[in-house]
Amino acid sequence: MADTGKGSASASCNDRCGCPSPCPGGESCRCKMMSEASGGDQEHNTCPCGEHCGCNPCNCPKTQTQTSAKGCTCGEGCTCATCAA
């Protein structure tokens, strides 16, 4: 299995990190917090198997509108729990 980096700041792919689930990269797919690289901005994560996390917390279209979820933007038709929070 490929090591994806620092395991302490990673999580499995799911709607909470914005990666497709199941991830096309299999079990090696993880979301890493960019807080170290971006100087503490914890709302944005990157996924080796996808694009940016945080701004698109579920598998909704990237044509997003602001929602009440903390730091999240989701498409109009998005109904995942992360967007509803």
Swiss-Prot record:
Location(s), subcellular: Cytoplasm; Nucleus; Cell membrane
GO cellular component entries: cytoplasm; membrane; nucleus; plasma membrane
Entry GO MF terms: zinc ion binding
Misc note: Plants silencing both MT4A and MT4B have reduced seed weight and reduced seedling growth after germination.
Protein family (similarity comment): Belongs to the metallothionein superfamily. Type 15 family.
PANTHER family assigned to the protein according to its UniProt record, in alphabetical order: EC PROTEIN HOMOLOG (PTHR48198), METALLOTHIONEIN-LIKE PROTEIN 4A-RELATED (PTHR48198:SF1)
Protein name (record): Metallothionein-like protein 4B
